[in-house]
UniProtKB/Swiss-Prot annotation:
<dbReference type="InterPro" id="IPR023451">
    <property type="entry name" value="Thymidate_synth/dCMP_Mease_dom"/>
</dbReference>
<dbReference type="InterPro" id="IPR036926">
    <property type="entry name" value="Thymidate_synth/dCMP_Mease_sf"/>
</dbReference>
<dbReference type="GO" id="GO:0032259">
    <property type="term" value="P:methylation"/>
</dbReference>
<keyword id="KW-0899">Viral immunoevasion</keyword>
<keyword id="KW-0808">Transferase</keyword>
<dbReference type="GO" id="GO:0052170">
    <property type="term" value="P:symbiont-mediated suppression of host innate immune response"/>
</dbReference>
<dbReference type="Pfam" id="PF00303">
    <property type="entry name" value="Thymidylat_synt"/>
</dbReference>
<dbReference type="GO" id="GO:0008168">
    <property type="term" value="F:methyltransferase activity"/>
</dbReference>
<keyword id="KW-1258">Restriction-modification system evasion by virus</keyword>
<keyword id="KW-0489">Methyltransferase</keyword>
<keyword id="KW-1090">Inhibition of host innate immune response by virus</keyword>
<protein>
    <recommendedName>
        <fullName>Deoxyuridylate hydroxymethyltransferase</fullName>
        <ecNumber>2.1.2.-</ecNumber>
    </recommendedName>
</protein>
<comment type="similarity">
    <text>Belongs to the thymidylate synthase family.</text>
</comment>
<comment type="function">
    <text>Catalyzes formation of 5-hydroxymethyldeoxyuridylate (5HMdUMP) as a step in the pathway that replaces dTMP by thymidine hypermodifications in the viral genome. As a final result of the pathway of hypermodification, 5-Nalpha-putrescinylthymidine (Nalpha-PutT) substitutes for about 50% of thymidines in the viral DNA. These modifications probably prevent degradation of viral genome by the host restriction-modification antiviral defense system.</text>
</comment>
<keyword id="KW-0945">Host-virus interaction</keyword>
<dbReference type="GO" id="GO:0099018">
    <property type="term" value="P:symbiont-mediated evasion of host restriction-modification system"/>
</dbReference>
Length: 357
């Protein structure tokens, strides 16, 4: 078995497809706590366009609306799954040790100890620094004594962070980022939400520091898929694939601090919680989020606004507030892009989507 695997491509979809293909051809099978899995050792995934993050793989059941919502939740710094996250991910409580929080939620850990702000400050001060990093792993939370103290003797945690640390460097005046991952599911983690949320973070840091966006890589010690989901892997590999490009549209932020960044995303999530609880309707949510964009200097025509609009409409549609073709939804997103195709192929079918040309 090859002890090292390097997979490099333009975007997430192409890289994930290549990873699944290689695992299917050369991966090793083993039994583990979640059933049998086929895995590759020491996989270095690398993409040259982090904006090409929107997953579009035929045969793969993926909901772009859920990915966007979870990423906003991560960036809000929350670990609480009630009210908001479980609306999008009904299975979220299955991974909670107390039924309320995810023990390994990335948001609280990334913002802890002022890590993100420290990284931003270092990068602005010295573009040659090698000290810009963010730790997700935390022995004070994840060691056996810490787990026992938090949840009781003999407790086996349901959620220990797979992603452990983030390295950020400036290479040729571009902000490049690498994430170290101990273990990654190529269908539901390392091949799905993880590259989406971390390239999203990378772009936020790029805009906060003023550097152009560089490449992204994620290094996975054990990249695998489970036997229970092998049919879905086979469906992906048998299907004809088009790896759609990204249109290059930036998020459109320039947060002056990590605190402002967290405040903004927490504010947007609070609006959505009100919408989910039917305290406000679609129109009120739309205008409240517009106000937040204005207050924090986020461009109303940037990709972040497209993402926010998607979630706002998704909530309204799930609650039956809108039906049929909704022509106002993201008319500036071409169908021949990764995001346009991610929306069109989403399994969520409660409303039609009409995009731009």
């Amino acid at each position: 078995m090859n002890p090292f695997n390097i997979i490099s491509d333009t975007g997430v979809s192409a890289a994930v497809y290549a990873g699944l293909s290689r695992a299917k051809c050369t991966g090793q099978y083993k039994e583990c706590r979640n059933g049998g899995s086929t895995f590759l050792r020491n996989v270095k995934f690398h993409i040259t366009d982090p904006r090409n993050r929107n997953l579009t793989l035929n045969g793969r059941k993926s909901n772009i609306f859920q990915m966007v919502a979870e990423t906003f939740w991560v960036m809000s710094g929350s670990g609480n799954i009630k009210e908001f996250l479980e609306f999008f991910l009904p299975r979220a409580p299955q991974y909670s040790d107390d039924g309320i929080n995810w023990h390994g939620a990335y948001g609280p850990r990334m913002y802890a100890h002022n890590q993100l702000q420290s990284a931003i400050d270092l990068l602005i001060k010295d573009k040659d620094t090698r000290r810009a990093y963010v730790m997700i792993a935390d022995p004070t939370l994840d060691s056996a004594p810490a787990i026992e103290a938090a949840y009781g003797v003999g407790h086996s945690p349901k959620d220990v962070p797979c992603n452990r640390e983030i390295h950020i460097n400036i290479i040729e005046d571009k902000l490049c980022m690498k994430v170290i991952q101990r273990s990654g599911d190529m269908l539901f983690g390392t091949g799905s939400i993880n590259p989406f949320e971390f390239t999203f973070l990378q772009e936020l840091l790029s805009e906060a520091t003023g550097y152009a966006l560089g490449d992204y890589q994620w290094d996975v010690t054990d990249a695998h898929y489970y036997k229970a989901f092998e049919d879905q892997v086979n469906d992906v590999l048998r299907s004809e694939q088009t790896f759609w490009p990204n249109d290059g549209k930036p998020l459109g932020t320039r947060f002056t601090s990590a605190t402002k960044m967290q405040e903004f995303f927490a504010g947007v999530v609070r609006v959505w919680v009100k919408q989910i609880n039917r305290l406000i309707d679609l129109g009120d949510a739309h205008y409240a989020i517009n106000d937040l964009f204005a207050d924090y200097g986020v461009l109303p025509e940037g990709r972040l606004r497209d993402y926010a609009k998607m979630v706002t409409f998704y909530i309204a549609a799930k609650q039956g507030e809108i039906e049929g073709d909704f022509k106002a939804l993201l008319t500036n997103i071409p169908t021949n892009t990764d995001l346009g195709q991610a929306i069109l192929t989403s399994p969520f079918r409660k409303f039609g989507v009409v995009l731009g040309d």
